[in-house]
């Protein structure tokens, strides 16, 4: 089966997928660390969600921020120790970035909650679903017919309809979403359709750095684009096809495969 992570890697750089598949046979912890970091971020968001239910409409923005922040530091500290004990070479700067992003997100959420409570004249508990719909996290999906498998970061369920959400820590484009993010999302959408016998018309990319959830329409062209990418991934992973790529200074400068790529 093709893992959605292979599609993501191919969309970033086909040569990176080739090297990971056929050349780099050394065991590394990068993938597991990425999973743990993403899980930590989603658990933090879930804790903010729980804290929100205690907010009253008469609270000030500062009080709302304080309430949303309850137990956040303690949770991040304990989770960080757990990850460090896994010997995954966790960079402390990565945790600092997560802390900064978390409190930035809390400030934005506090402003939105205060505005919503003022307009609706309700406590946060009564409007929680506006900000945090019923959802499932890190849901494993697969389709044996498509030979596709992956983990969807989040699936929101609103009025019986399913909305896949991909969570991104990267910088977003000025408008819309990056092509590779859209392709990953439509892959998850198709798997959601198979898993829950439903139709998915819209999904979302959540860009953490600006706390912005952007919609993506799951149209025919995007679905066709996914199948073309799947074909290209199979050419590399199954047929050992060496891809032609152009050097991109922004992508290549920090890539751990830069030297191996030049050799090939």
What is the role of each PLM region?
Residues 46-59, 218-235:
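Charged/polar, low-hydrophobicity segments characteristic of intrinsically disordered regions
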Residues 20-29, 193-199, 263-264:
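Short helix-capping/linker segments at secondary-structure and domain boundaries
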Residues 5-19, 238-264:
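Cysteine-cluster motifs in flexible loop/terminal segments that predominantly coordinate metals
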């Amino acid at each position: 089966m093709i893992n959605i992570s292979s599609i993501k890697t191919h969309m970033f750089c086909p040569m990176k997928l080739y090297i990971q598949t056929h050349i780099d046979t050394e065991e590394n912890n990068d993938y597991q660390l990425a999973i743990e970091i993403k899980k930590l971020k989603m658990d933090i968001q879930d804790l903010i969600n729980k804290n929100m239910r205690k907010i009253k409409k008469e609270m000030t923005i500062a009080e709302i921020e304080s309430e949303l922040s309850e137990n956040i530091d303690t949770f991040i500290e304990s989770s960080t120790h757990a990850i460090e004990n896994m010997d995954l070479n966790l960079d402390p700067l990565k945790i600092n970035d997560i802390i900064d992003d978390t409190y930035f997100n809390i400030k934005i959420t506090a402003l939105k909650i205060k505005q919503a409570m003022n307009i609706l004249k309700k406590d946060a508990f009564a409007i929680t679903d506006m900000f945090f719909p019923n959802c499932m996290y890190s849901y494993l999906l697969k389709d044996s017919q498509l030979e596709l498998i992956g983990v969807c970061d989040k699936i929101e369920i609103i009025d019986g309809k399913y909305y896949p959400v991909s969570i991104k820590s990267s910088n977003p484009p000025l408008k819309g979403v990056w092509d590779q993010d859209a392709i990953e999302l439509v892959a998850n959408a198709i798997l959601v359709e198979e898993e829950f016998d439903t139709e998915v018309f819209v999904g979302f990319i959540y860009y953490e750095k600006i706390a912005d959830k952007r919609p993506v329409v799951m149209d025919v062209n995007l679905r066709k684009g996914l199948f073309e990418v799947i074909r290209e991934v199979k050419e590399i992973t199954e047929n050992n096809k060496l891809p032609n790529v152009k050097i991109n200074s922004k992508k290549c400068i920090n890539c751990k495969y830069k030297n191996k790529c030049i050799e090939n």
